[in-house]
Curated annotation (Swiss-Prot):
Record carries keyword Oxidoreductase: yes
EC number: 1.2.7.7
CDD domains: TPP_PYR_PFOR_IOR-alpha_like (cd07034)
Entry keywords, A to Z: Oxidoreductase
InterPro entries hit by this protein: 2-oxoacid_oxidoreductase, PFOR_II, Pyrv_Fd/Flavodoxin_OxRdtase_N, THDP-binding, Transketo_C/PFOR_II
Protein's recorded name: Ketoisovalerate oxidoreductase subunit VorB
pH dependence comment: Optimum pH is 9.7.
Residue ranges of the TM segments: none
Keyword RNA-binding annotated: no
A Gene Ontology molecular function term of the record: 3-methyl-2-oxobutanoate dehydrogenase (ferredoxin) activity
Stored PANTHER family: SUBUNIT OF PYRUVATE:FLAVODOXIN OXIDOREDUCTASE, SUBUNIT OF PYRUVATE:FLAVODOXIN OXIDOREDUCTASE-RELATED
One GO biological process term: sulfur compound biosynthetic process
Activity relative to temperature: Optimum temperature is 75 degrees Celsius.
Amino acid sequence: MATQMVKGNTAVIIGAMYAGCDCYFGYPITPASEILHEASRYFPLVGRKFVQAESEEAAINMVYGAAAAGHRVMTASSGPGMSLKQEGISFLAGAELPAVIVDVMRAGPGLGNIGPEQADYNQLVKGGGHGNYRNIVLAPNSVQEMCDLTMDAFELADKYRNPVIILADAVLGQMAEPLRFPERAVEHRPDTSWAVCGSRETMKNLVTSIFLDFDELEEFNFYLQEKYAAVEENEVRYEEYMVEDAEIVLVAYGISSRVAKSAVDTARADGIKVGLLRPITLFPFPSERIRELAEGGCTFISVEMSSGQMREDIKMASGCRDVELVNRMGGNLIELRDILRKIREIAGESND
């Protein structure tokens, strides 16, 4: 198995190509631009389609068209660009079209800056666009997972005919780590049972999100909720670290989870029983596991680079318990000492 030092953004394209992605449509925006650059470099070499669109809106609508034709298709952006894509993502969900969308989060709101943040959580985990839809959301915390979860994203998108979001951040996109390349590539073939491929076989298929009859649209919405319930039942993923006897549990995803893990090790060395729960899927969220830990008397600390958006989901899952927060915003990374200060405060120890 080949191993090479690559950046997180490059790992996304490696995963996409091994997953059989045959179309990429995008628009450059820092800190996600390398994903587009690498797609432009490698996709045409192997006969796959690449277009640098004239805008973020154009890119997401090209994704819609290619997905409707049965292609494995993706795009990527960051912050302001993701806001511009929200209408198109709602249309993808409404038409039940599979697509993979990567968000390399940057600091906001507005133009903000190109530093890392995790403040797109609500926008993408809760939907973001109009209507009653959900995205499946995967949260990598390493360059390896930037590749592996991209591959998984295409499988989930096809399985549920739904947009799948890779929710990364500027650090993960720009950092370089050793990447173990996938063992084998996937050859994707369009699903002619629903796709519109321009053939006699698919000429009666219809891809649309419009329902002029109110009752039909309501019925479709109920159907979508049943689909999302199936996602919640079958696709929850998380990683635990030293939670077996933990009295304090850190909940963190993405790059913040790596700092949180170091905090667990340091606190454990001081005799404090701390563990880490890392959600890998943000939707579906590991609510049941958090409920179990809450019933065992754990105190939760949400560690995130936002105002506390994920903390609300932890509160709900834990039965509306108080959840502590360690956070930074504006492009600042959470530091080890920030987490340790909160742990020691809860444990009743000195911060010295």
